[in-house]
């Protein structure tokens, strides 16, 4: 789709499944594919994200950087992925999906009931917390405009915890350690 590559310059930031990547090459085409956009992806990115699991033709969430004068829906995300979370269970209801995500123990303290979390780049509200991680409650609109509804049990989503929550918890823990 041309809108995705219009005015796309080298060095631009693009989020793929919520992971901020820098454009290093854009190839326009007259064929079925409008363009190919190239990024450098380093080992750390492959280890922390689901990008290494992608194959040619994989459906991804694609988002350009926010620009002044555009609506900002959800919470602010940076594209700096903290970890991945594996889908443990999917419950398909009449008008929504409930998805249980298994989150690494290290990151569970940063995910709060009714708090924000970025999942494959989608700004979402945490539905429930359990001992394994957390649940998402996804409405049809979210399922339609993201790749979250295409996922199956065992797939992994990129997770970026809310930066304010992360900063507050780490600041309090550091303070308590220094003053105990």
Range-by-range predicted roles:
Residues 1-180:
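Conserved loop->alpha-helix
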């Amino acid at each position: 789709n041309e809108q995705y590559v219009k005015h796309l310059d080298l060095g631009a930031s693009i989020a793929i499944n919520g992971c901020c990547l820098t454009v290093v090459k854009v190839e326009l085409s007259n064929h079925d594919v409008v363009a190919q956009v190239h990024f450098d992806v380093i080992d750390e990115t492959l280890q922390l994200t689901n990008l290494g699991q992608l194959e040619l033709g994989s459906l991804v969430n694609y988002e350009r950087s926010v620009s002044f004068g555009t609506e900002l829906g959800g919470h602010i995300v940076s594209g700096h992925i903290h970890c991945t979370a594996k889908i443990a269970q999917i419950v398909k209801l009449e008008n929504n999906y409930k998805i249980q995500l298994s989150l690494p123990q290290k990151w569970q303290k940063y995910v709060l009931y009714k708090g924000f979390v970025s999942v494959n780049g989608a700004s979402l509200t945490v539905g429930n917390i359990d001992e394994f991680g957390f649940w998402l409650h996804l409405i049809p609109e979210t399922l339609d405009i993201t790749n979250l509804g295409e996922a199956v049990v065992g797939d992994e989503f990129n997770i970026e915890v809310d930066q304010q929550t992360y900063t507050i918890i780490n600041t309090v823990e550091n303070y308590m350690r220094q003053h105990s």
